[in-house]
Structures are given as C-alpha cells and as structure tokens.
C-alpha cells in the first residue's frame, strides 16, 4: 500500500522546491541530505511530503518524548490510512541497576512500565512485520537492544479458518509467546477459554480481541470482537498473533542459551576465585543460577535483557538488535532537530557501558551483560540506508555528510526573521528595563536569557521590585509547571520570562516581540552560533519581533548568527515583495500549548478532595475515577499528567488500606 498524504494545505513558499530537491536527491541515490528550515516554516509538512513521494518505510528520530509525541500526532493526521507508530522508552520511571563500590551500595533496577507505551512499541514492530507503509516516530531509545526480529516474527502465530489446530495446542503456543491465561480479568496480553472458544487480547491491540472458534481439532471461525461489549466486529480470513514481549525466545533456544550462560558463569567464578574475590564469586553464582532456573521453568526472568547475547547467539561485541533491524533494507531515517539528536545518539553508549562495567567487576552481572547496550555511533551509521537531517541550525556532522541541502526560509505566514541590534554591556540592565517597559506598554511579551542561575534570579528580583510582572523559568521546574508558566505568560498573567537554556527549541510563543540576550559575547555552549540562532528564532513568531544582544565585542558565533539571520531576512523580504505578502503574527490558541497540564487541571477539584473525609465506598469510587483518568491520559500520550494521577492513586490506595 502507498502512503496517502491528507492535508487541506498545499506546499507554499520554499516548501515545493525543498520537497522536489530532497526527493530527487534521494531517488538519485544520495545517502545523506539536510532540510534547513527556519522556525515556523512548516518543516513537518515538508517531511510528510517527502515520505509520501519516496513511499518507503520511515523512522523519525526525535531527541525527547514530548517532541516525539507531537510529531506522532501530526503524522497520524497527515497519514490516517497508513500505519503511523510510536516507539519511545516505556518507563514512566526508571532507576537502572547500579553498584556504588565506595559505599558498598547495590541499587536494584526499579521501574514503572507505562502499559500504553508498551502496547504502542509492540504495535510498531507488528506493523513493520506486516506492511510497508509504516512511519515510526521514535526517541533515541530506538538504538537500544531489542529482541531478535527473526525470532519475534518466527514465533508469531498464523491463524486461518480451516486450519488443523486444537484449542489446547493454541493455548500452549500463546504461553510460549508470554501470554497468560486469565478467564476472569481479560486484558492486553492475556487469553481466556470457554468450551470450544478461545479469546485472545493481542498485546499490540487497543480494544479489540480475536475470538477463535473450534470444531474438534480444526479452527471453524475467527472473528474480531469488541472487548467491552463482546459485539462481533467482523470475520477474519487470516490473523497473526505477535509475541507479548520483544524478548521472546523458543524454549529449545532458551535451554541451549542456558548451557552457554553456565559455561560463562564457570569461567567467571574461576576468575574471581583466582583473584581471591570470594564474595564476588558467590554473588555471581547465586544470581546467575537463579536466573537460569527461572528461564528454564518459565521462559523468562527479571533482567532477561542482560542475557540477550546468549539468547540471540551473537558473538561478543556484536551490535545488538534494535528497532532499526525490524525495518527492511530500503528505508528512510529522518533525524528531527538533528543538531541535538545526533550528539545525543553518539553519547548513549559511553554512559551505559560505564555503569555496567562496575556491575560486572563486582559480580552482579556476567561480562556478556555489556552487550545489552545501545548501538555505538559507528554501528548506528552502519545501519543507515538513507537519512534526512532536519534542523534550523545544522551542525558539524550534518555539514560533513550531507550531499544536498534544501533550504526552507520562507514562512507561509510571511513572517521575517527578527532584526538584531547589539548594545554595550555597560548599563545593560537599565537599558533592558527601559526596553521592557516599552514592550509591556503595548501589551507585548519579553524573553530574557542570561548565562547563570544567579544572574537570572537577581534580575527577576530586581525587575519585580520595579513593578514589572516577571517570572523565572529554571531547570528545577518540571514539565507540567513549565507549561503552566508559559500559559500564564500567554494569558497576560505576567509579561517577562527570564531563563538560561530553556528559551530555545520548542518554546514558540507568538506574543513575544523582544528577545534579549545578556552577555552575548561570552563564547561557550550557551552562546554558540547554534544556540544564538535558535534563541533568535523565538522572536520570529510575531511581525514586530526583534532581538537585542548585549555585548562589548562581536564574537565569531555572534557574527555567524547575525549574518545568517540577515541573509534569511533579505530572502524573506524579497519573496514577500514579489508576492504581495504582508507578514502576519501567528495565531495560536493558548489551549494548544497547555494540553498536558489541562489534563490534570480539568479535574483539580476531584484531585484536591480530602480522602480522610470520605467513606470507604466514596474512596473506592474516587480511586476508580482517578485510575480511569490516569489510563486516559496515558492513552493520549500525556505522560506527565498520567504520572500526576499515578502519584495521587498511590496516596489514595494507602488511605484506603488504613481504613480497612
């Protein structure tokens, strides 16, 4: 099936030529290309058009869950007839296994798995197995080890009416796929049996179960049923049941792998005893033998991913299997915000190895556990077929590898890159206060970026004393509160937002008319050309947007950022003049910005009820309501809201236990 792009808009401005250039280059065999798109130029729409034109499976990698969620939502709207999937870390909370030798402290792995994301991850690999028209939006967790695609696909169960297969045989096969039988509580990853009928709730399904009806030792009929109502939706001529976990292996292979694990264990115990490390020898023997026994008995154990090398029969040091291995050979990778995402991919391997090496050295894990890891950067490069970098500020890696660069400088709204002025550091605060007063008198908003937390706090306090409505956005503020602060700025609760490194990607506030950059001439990460261009972009959503840099000299980074902004502005002005376009400030509803926080705020009263004053019955009902809201928030990918509900749920359940 081909990709079918649905949109009420047609490509405009620079989009048509950018799409044409990129598609032509990839069809001619280019491996690396770059889309340089300024803030607000419609890069996501261009990406969608490129995917539709190339018509090949696509992996979009984003540098965080929130942005991945936004892209996932947009791509689902663009491609409603195709498989758009979401693959990020399924942990709401994750404390990795670790050991601190200095204090002899072992920290066991502790995690809370988000059931909804687990389903979406399984759905992504199922879609890649069954069809070609697949877009997977992922975070960098896509480079972490996953089970073998061949094993996962090979163990899947194919069912057809007329197939010779008895009910008990199918039940045993489902257990091998890590499904559990539960005739009372039917949920994702379970099956139930009633006479000659076996119902399966696929691990990658939402609200649809598969009902298999038998006549003797033959499948008589297969239907889809609504889990809630039991209503038959449709009959099926064929269905595939995929494993309930990515770490699924046949019992035969598990038994063989256990023999290899025992060999490695013997070698490790001998090594520790030879080094007179008797505690480590005893520790590794006890822990590993327990895991081996669990795998032989149940086909699974806690931390089974640490034995991935043995379960996949891979050689020491071989690259792990990842989500990328589920894609066919001919596929496209799009790296969103590549100037951040590429370095992030490069940094994953070293941090993971450092922690695991300590566990191995002190007898908590076998050396083979080091192969349960993310890809290193060279291995990641080895899996690239074709790659599109997307960024407003491509970095060194993109510059060195791209064979083609398409620029998207024209905004559909006609908005120009802001004008920039450079002013001396001496007297910068008084000058800034004067500029802030001018902007706020016209009901405009201001962003100020400083270099240090101390300066941000002092500036915020000073302005507040002068009667300016100001708030400070710092790194200790969580995602929900951050969204609320931005909402308050847009709703005119205050006028000036001060921050350090939080004013760059993803902070698009159309009401901003002034961005002030203090100490712009202090070379470093926060004042690099990339950071400066991204910060300048925050003023590009308003037709009156402008930027003031406070500096005593023009650094190389400042010069590049200023020259690039001037170049873009000139191109934009010429285009607007030629086409009779008047720049229009972006109109964006405040509700769009705070969807996450509203999930919690919508029922603030319910959350704030005093559980101590409730009867047992009221408390049980309240718990059920909160649990429902938590699952709904998770289903809508509002994970911060879901976490808030989860914390409330724990508290309420503790209160209920005390009442009992």
Curated annotation (Swiss-Prot):
The keyword Isomerase does not apply. The UvrABC repair system catalyzes the recognition and processing of DNA lesions. A damage recognition complex composed of 2 UvrA and 2 UvrB subunits scans DNA for abnormalities. Upon binding of the UvrA(2)B(2) complex to a putative damaged site, the DNA wraps around one UvrB monomer. DNA wrap is dependent on ATP binding by UvrB and probably causes local melting of the DNA helix, facilitating insertion of UvrB beta-hairpin between the DNA strands. Then UvrB probes one DNA strand for the presence of a lesion. Residues 620-655 form the UVR domain. The gene is uvrB. A motif (Beta-hairpin) lies at residues 90-113. The beta-hairpin motif is involved in DNA binding. This is UvrABC system protein B. Keywords: ATP-binding, Cytoplasm, DNA damage, DNA excision, DNA repair, Excision nuclease, Helicase, Hydrolase, Nucleotide-binding, SOS response. Its main location: cytoplasm. ATP binds at residues 37-44. It is found in: Cytoplasm. GO terms for molecular function: ATP binding; ATP hydrolysis activity; DNA binding; excinuclease ABC activity; helicase activity. It comes from the Bacteria. GO terms for cellular component: cytoplasm; excinuclease repair complex. Residues 428-594 form the Helicase C-terminal domain. Pfam families: Helicase_C, ResIII, UVR, UvrB, UvrB_inter. Belongs to the UvrB family. Forms a heterotetramer with UvrA during the search for lesions. Interacts with UvrC in an incision complex. InterPro entries: Helicase/UvrB_N, Helicase_ATP-bd, Helicase_C-like, P-loop_NTPase, UVR_dom, UVR_dom_sf, UvrB, UvrB_inter.
């Amino acid at each position: 099936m081909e990709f079918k792009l649905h949109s009420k808009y047609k490509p405009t401005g620079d989009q048509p030529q950018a799409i044409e250039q990129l598609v032509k280059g990839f069809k001619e065999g280019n491996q690396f290309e770059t889309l340089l798109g300024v803030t607000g130029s419609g890069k996501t729409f261009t990406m969608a058009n490129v995917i539709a034109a190339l018509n090949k499976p696509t992996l979009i990698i984003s540098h965080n869950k929130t942005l991945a969620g936004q892209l996932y939502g947009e791509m689902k709207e663009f491609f409603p007839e195709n498989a758009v999937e979401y693959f990020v870390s399924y942990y709401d909370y994750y404390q990795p296994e670790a050991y601190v030798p200095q204090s002899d402290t072992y920290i066991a792995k502790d995690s809370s798995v988000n059931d909804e994301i687990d389903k979406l991850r399984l759905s992504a690999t199922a879609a890649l197995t069954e069809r070609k028209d697949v877009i997977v939006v992922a975070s960098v967790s896509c480079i972490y080890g996953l089970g073998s695609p061949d094993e996962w696909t090979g163990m899947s169960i194919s069912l057809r009416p007329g197939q010779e297969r008895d009910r008990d045989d199918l039940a045993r096969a489902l257990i091998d796929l890590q499904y559990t039988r539960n005739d009372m509580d039917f949920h994702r990853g379970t099956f139930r049996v009633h006479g000659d009928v076996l119902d399966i709730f696929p691990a990658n399904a939402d609200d649809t179960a598969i009902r298999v009806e038998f006549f003797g030792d033959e499948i008589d009929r297969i239907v889809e049923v609504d889990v809630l109502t039991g209503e038959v939706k449709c009959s099926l001529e064929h269905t595939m049941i995929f494993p309930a976990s990515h770490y699924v292996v046949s019992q035969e292979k598990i038994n063989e792998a256990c023999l290899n694990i025992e060999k490695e264990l013997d070698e490790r115990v001998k090594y520790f005893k030879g080094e007179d490390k008797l505690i480590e020898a005893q520790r590794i023997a006890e822990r590993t033998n327990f895991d081996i026994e669990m795998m032989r008995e149940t086909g699974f154990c806690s931390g089974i991913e640490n034995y991935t090398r043995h379960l996949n029969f891979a050689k020491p040091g071989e690259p792990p299997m990842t989500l990328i291995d589920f894609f066919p050979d001919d596929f496209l990778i799009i790296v969103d915000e590549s100037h951040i995402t590429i370095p992030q991919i490069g940094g994953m391997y070293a941090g993971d190895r450092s922690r695991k090496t300590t566990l191995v050295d002190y007898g908590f894990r076998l050396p083979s556990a080091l192969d349960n890891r993310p890809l290193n950067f060279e291995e990641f490069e080895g899996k690239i077929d074709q790659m599109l970098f997307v960024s407003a500020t491509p970095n060194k890696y993109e510059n060195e590898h791209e064979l083609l660069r398409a620029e998207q400088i024209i905004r559909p709204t006609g908005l120009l890159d802001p004008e920039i002025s450079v002013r001396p550091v001496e007297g910068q605060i008084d000058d800034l206060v004067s500029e802030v007063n001018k902007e706020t008198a016209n009901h405009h908003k201001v962003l100020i970026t400083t270099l240090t937390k101390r300066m941000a706090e002092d500036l915020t306090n000073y302005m507040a004393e002068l009667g300016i409505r100001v708030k400070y956005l710092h790194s200790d503020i969580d995602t929900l509160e951050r969204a609320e602060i931005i909402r308050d700025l847009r709703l005119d609760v205050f006028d000036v937002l001060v921050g350090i490194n939080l004013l760059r990607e993803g902070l698009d506030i159309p009401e901003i008319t002034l961005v002030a950059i203090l100490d712009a001439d202090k070379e470093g990460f926060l004042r690099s050309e990339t950071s400066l261009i991204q910060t300048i972009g925050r003023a590009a959503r308003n037709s009156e947007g402008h930027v003031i840099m406070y500096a005593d000299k023009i650094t190389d980074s400042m010069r590049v950022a200023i020259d690039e902004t001037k170049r873009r502005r000139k191109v934009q002005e010429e285009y607007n003049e030629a086409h009779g376009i008047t720049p229009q400030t972006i109109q964006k509803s405040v509700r769009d910005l705070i969807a996450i926080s509203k999930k919690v705020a919508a029922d603030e009263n319910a959350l704030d009820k005093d559980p101590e004053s409730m009867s047992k019955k009221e408390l049980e009902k309240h718990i059920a309501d909160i649990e429902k809201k938590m699952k709904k928030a998770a289903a809508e990918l509002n994970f911060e809201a879901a976490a808030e509900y989860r914390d409330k749920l724990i508290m309420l359940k503790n209160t209920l236990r005390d009442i009992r």
